[in-house]
Amino acid sequence: MFTGLIETIGKVAGIKSLSDGKSFRIECRFDSGEYELGESIAVDGVCVTVEEFDEGGFTFSASEETLRRSTLADKRIGHKVHLERALRLGDRLGGHIVQGHVDDVGRVLQLKRKSTGADLVIEIPETLRSYVVEKGSLAVQGVSLTVAAISAGNATLALIPATLQKTYLGDLKSGDGVNLEVDVLAKYVESLLPGRRGGIDEEKLRQWGFG
């Protein structure tokens, strides 16, 4: 489990094709702690397993399914990646619960710079729209963000200066793909409510007594 608070930004240093996926070498340096073989790390929001490591970085493999459902397939040598190690007992949950299981890939529509921060507008895949609500949480490239507004299937997310400083979200351009993971709590709520197969919307929540 992760929090969506990025620890550091790494760089893709090597990519090898495998019979059933790809192997990636990531150059990075965390502020504290050492790697362990088998450790879980979120790479742009994708939970991967450390297979090899040294003081300069680590190596992991991604299956064809993972590549198909995430932006890892588009990574090239030199590209940046957000990195976060899994939560440990006693750690603070500063963002929101992020599993590292990417639900789908969204598309950047616009990055609007403001005097302080920026607004990131993303087209949300139709299959995920019922889970994305105003003031709710959404993980974008592994970063825990709050949805500022929803309009016609698009989500606007406010990027504060600290987020722009600690992530590469400010480098995104129109048309870029981004890994999306919706709030797992929304999935649990849907699974418990009647008529869940039709998804959740504001009208259904009112019918069921919420708000």
Question: Each predicted region: which residue ranges?
Answer:
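Conserved loop->alpha-helix
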Residues: M1-G211
